[in-house]
Amino acid sequence: VYSNSGEGLHRFVDPADDEVYLYTQFETGDARRMYACFDQPDQKATFKISTIVPAHWEVISNYGVDATKDLDGDKKFIQFAESQVIATYVTAIVAGAYQSVHDEYQCDKTIPLGIYARKSFFKYVDAENIFEVTKQGFAYFEETFGLAYPFGKYDQIAVAEYNWGAMENVGCVTFHEDVLIFRSKVTERSYISRATTIHHEMAHMWFGDLVTMKWWQDLWLNESFAEWASYM
């Protein structure tokens, strides 16, 4: 089931502490590597994801946790809330010994916010700036689009060995570690670039995730809209 190519369900072992980390990357047609589905952008469905993982792991998916249960063998069962109707390519599971920090955005509803990184990288997370940029994006897009954030929570996860800059999984946005986390002093341009990427992926929640093209030949609509919106 695991891959080492960054497609489907990718497995990474951190050389710093031997902790194991998993993440999914399904765009364009790799959800079928992990579960049986009609893996097309127009064939949307509701999803109710559950996992069994080591007891010390964190698991992040598109929606919040609905139920948990401790199991024998130092494992645990996690059931996530059922999703809205979404495309297969924006479903996601991220799991491992992640550390996290949390906040919330207040609008007509409360949106839980999370930032996750592997244990050996977490000390570099600039949560204050990332949360500030995230909240600014929500405020601007909700007002500009005239539509409240259409999903539940909003987590942003830095993952290792990532082929992309970032991916707009519903409520579970994955980023290349070097895009989201700065391990040394950087220029103002780097902060602007990170903010642009955060807002690009956030714009996809409305255009790409909520409203989705019928087939991959029109993926440029998703990307051009998100790129335009990220500079607004």
Can you annotate each of these PLM segments?
Residues 25-29, 36-199, 227-228:
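Hydrophobic helix-coil surface modules that form long, contiguous segments used
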Residues 1-16, 36, 72-74:
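A surface-exposed beta-strand-loop module
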Residues 14, 142-146, 207-208, 230-231:
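Sec-exported extracytoplasmic/periplasmic mature domains
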Residues 202-217, 232:
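Catalytic Zn2+-binding segment of zinc metalloproteases
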Residues 127-131, 215-223:
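Active-site metal-coordination segments of metallo-dependent hydrolases
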Residues 16-20, 41:
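N-terminal, polar/Ser/Thr-rich
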Residues 2-5, 61-63, 231-232:
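Short, intrinsically disordered, charge-balanced linker/junction segments flanking boundaries
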Residues 223-232:
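Acidic/His/Gly-enriched intrinsically disordered linker/tail segments
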